[in-house]
């Protein structure tokens, strides 16, 4: 009860030392569609559940797995409109870096800059935190990278992780299945199986999205490619 008076103020700490609006933003992430990221020896895979709104909906009109540069891509759990703002901001930050240094932005640099944007929205008046967590995959300096960034602006490097609805089940499954020698092909299968752990209904190429990042760059798999992977694990 004592914290209720602080729940609408973003810039005021509650007596227990929390910024309650950030707690609410994390709750929005935990209620969002599940997403999974796995770093393999030769690449990174991102996978997410894509809810079908209606049979009349054009599935290709909006994507959850988005490329930021040729070698970096990301996915989210949480609020879609907030994510699209961050996608645009991330692309702009990457372009600004290229204009200054004449080389592609390293993955860790982009994560740091996007996380700084998210952190700004936790201490400014008249705004609210972003209701999304991001998984950012990249390839540079001959190796893969996987990061997660939260509404608070905190970011961490991961070998494999899950977020969104039932993320605890996803992480438990990954802890059992993950090993350091995982190849990209196996990682794709593992990511889909992780999503399947908490998936409701029939999993098809229309209601999941998969992106991969390796030496060749980042790409979103086509529905036909996803269908082949689903057939392989059936």
Swiss-Prot record:
Pfam families: Proteasome, Proteasome_A_N. Keywords: Acetylation, Cytoplasm, Nucleus, Phosphoprotein, Proteasome. It is found in: Cytoplasm; Nucleus. The modification Phosphotyrosine is found at residue 121. The keyword Endoplasmic reticulum does not apply. It comes from the Eukaryota. The modification N-acetylalanine is found at residue 2. One of its GO terms (cellular component) is cytoplasm. InterPro entries: Ntn_hydrolases_N (IPR029055), Proteasome_alpha (IPR050115), Proteasome_alpha-type (IPR023332), Proteasome_asu_N (IPR000426), Proteasome_sua/b (IPR001353). Belongs to the peptidase T1A family. The 26S proteasome consists of a 20S proteasome core and two 19S regulatory subunits. The 20S proteasome core is a barrel-shaped complex made of 28 subunits that are arranged in four stacked rings. The two outer rings are each formed by seven alpha subunits, and the two inner rings are formed by seven beta subunits. The proteolytic activity is exerted by three beta-subunits PSMB5, PSMB6 and PSMB7. Component of the 20S core proteasome complex involved in the proteolytic degradation of most intracellular proteins. This complex plays numerous essential roles within the cell by associating with different regulatory particles. Associated with two 19S regulatory particles, forms the 26S proteasome and thus participates in the ATP-dependent degradation of ubiquitinated proteins. This is Proteasome subunit alpha type-2. It comes from Xenopus laevis (African clawed frog).
């Amino acid at each position: 009860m004592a914290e209720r008076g602080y729940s609408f103020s973003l810039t005021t700490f509650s007596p227990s030392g929390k910024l309650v609006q950030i707690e609410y933003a994390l709750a929005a992430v935990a209620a969002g569609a599940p997403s999974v990221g796995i770093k393999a020896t030769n690449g990174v895979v991102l996978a997410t559940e894509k809810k079908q709104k209606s049979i009349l909906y054009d599935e290709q009109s909006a994507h959850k797995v988005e490329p930021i540069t040729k070698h970096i891509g990301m996915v989210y759990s949480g609020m879609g409109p907030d994510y699209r703002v961050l996608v645009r901001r991330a692309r702009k930050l990457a372009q600004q870096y290229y204009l200054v240094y004449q080389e592609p932005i390293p993955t860790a640099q982009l994560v740091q800059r996007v996380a700084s944007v998210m952190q700004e929205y936790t201490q400014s008046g008249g705004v609210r935190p972003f209701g999304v967590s991001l998984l950012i995959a990249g390839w540079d300096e001959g190796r893969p990278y996987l990061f997660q960034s939260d509404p608070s602006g905190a970011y961490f490097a991961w070998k494999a992780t899950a977020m969104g609805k039932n993320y605890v089940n996803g992480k438990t499954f990954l802890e059992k299945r993950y090993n350091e020698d995982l190849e990209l092909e196996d990682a794709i299968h593992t990511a889909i199986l992780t999503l399947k752990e908490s998936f409701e209904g029939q999993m098809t190429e229309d209601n999941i999205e998969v992106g991969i990042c390796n030496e060749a760059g980042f790409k979103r798999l086509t529905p036909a490619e996803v269908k082949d992977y689903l057939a392989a694990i059936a």
